[in-house]
Amino acid sequence: MPRILSIDYGQKRTGIAVTDEMQIIASGLTTIPTHTLIDFLKDYFAKEKVEAVLIGEPKQMNGQPSESASVINGFVTHFSNIFPDMKVIRVDERFTSKMAFQTMLDSGLSKKQRQNKGLIDEISATIMLQDYLSSKRF
């Protein structure tokens, strides 16, 4: 069974998570500089079977798009032009950064480790993907 990849897109860094081949567990894959994202995805798709890509949809508390939504929507359009056969699934990414930080606290990471913004992005992508997998099962 092909994997599902999750992208927590940011202007500087992008967190990436992926499922196992059975699409049961989401695991953090990496955080990369955003300007290298398309090349990273080309390489990854050449090596691994991926059936869909989850991309966070930033929203405000009232459900309206956040200020960064236009940048991410631009990326989604660009992504779809480069990978026209790849299914894109948009998911609400509200609170994922806060949940990622809380996960880091609960894991006992040091203050210095918790300041690693790249790790927060990777954990955020993992949380989005695991939430999606959980919702798919019900």
Curated annotation (Swiss-Prot):
The keyword Hydrolase applies. One of its GO terms (biological process) is rRNA 5'-end processing. Keywords: Cytoplasm, Hydrolase, Nuclease, Ribosome biogenesis. It is found in: Cytoplasm. The keyword Nuclease applies. GO terms for cellular component: cytosol. It comes from the Bacteria. It is an enzyme of class 3 (hydrolase). GO terms for molecular function: nuclease activity. Its EC number is 3.1.-.-. Belongs to the YqgF nuclease family. NCBIfam families: RNAse_H_YqgF. Could be a nuclease involved in processing of the 5'-end of pre-16S rRNA. This is Putative pre-16S rRNA nuclease. It comes from Flavobacterium johnsoniae (strain ATCC 17061 / DSM 2064 / JCM 8514 / BCRC 14874 / CCUG 350202 / NBRC 14942 / NCIMB 11054 / UW101) (Cytophaga johnsonae).
